[in-house]
Amino acid sequence: MIVVVFIVIFAVEKTFQQNLFIVMYEKIQETASWLKAKMVTHPTTAIILGTGLGRLAEEIQVEQAIDYKDIPNFPVSTVEGHSGKFIFGKLGGVDIIAMKGRFHYYEGYSMKEVTFPVRVLYELGIKTLFVSNAAGGMNPGFKIGDLMVITDHINFFPEHPLRGKNYPTGPRFPDMHETYDPSLIKLAGQIAREKKIRLQYGVYVGVQGPTFETPAEYRMYRTLGGDTVGMSTVPEVIVAHHCGIRIFGISVVTDLGGFDNPVEVSHEEVQEAADKAQPIMTEIMREMIVRSEKLEHSKNERYNTDHPTEEWKSQS
């Protein structure tokens, strides 16, 4: 009898996951189709702008800006500093899509919802994704206002964005070496030297939030190898990597913790520090986007970068 009950539970769970996959697939396709109808160009580069970094959008020659609330199936950001706009335009002469505002796990969204926009970007033809965030610095060599190129990450989120039925954009068990594209990291260094911009490199720790870290947590993350810590980016990067999209990530160090005399921090202070970093962030990101168009993808470009609509259908 107990065995029968377990079999029934397993069958119900499997059916639930299958139905969830189908529903999510249909939403992704519906949203992508709706946005494609609005597109007049076919950009292959996208940027996700985080806390206090939305002003980079002012550098974009906007062709069209759509509020998230007007896009079918799109979540709506609830965080101050995240205005919630999907922008088509040009930056440095390059056609791009910019997401002004992102979605966080701590807002109550599931990981499928947090990473939903990345799935849509993939369906729109995006091959390169730039992600930015505001983060707490744990490396003693960092200063407030520093830019840190993300070379790797540590995932401390309690739910994994690839949990559930596997999407055919990548393997069931994706390798995570060189998640952040080495050629783009090298390019950032070249630009920083040319522009005499102070640039750091390090490991970003992704956590759930919404509380800022305790001094003990800062020390733990630092001991584990983290250089900055924040409440975003990692889920988006994992899904983009699974889709075969090349990724460049950068953090603005907006506060410092984990040292002998940690100081209290507020969201307002984080925004203020991020705002002050706007000029150099804008300069380096503009150059990155323009020059990245001329870079070949890494030799180990992964998985399926074609848009497997028919394959999705066959698995649903």
Locate predicted features:
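Generic non-transmembrane alpha-helical segments
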Residues: 34, 38, 183, 187-198, ...
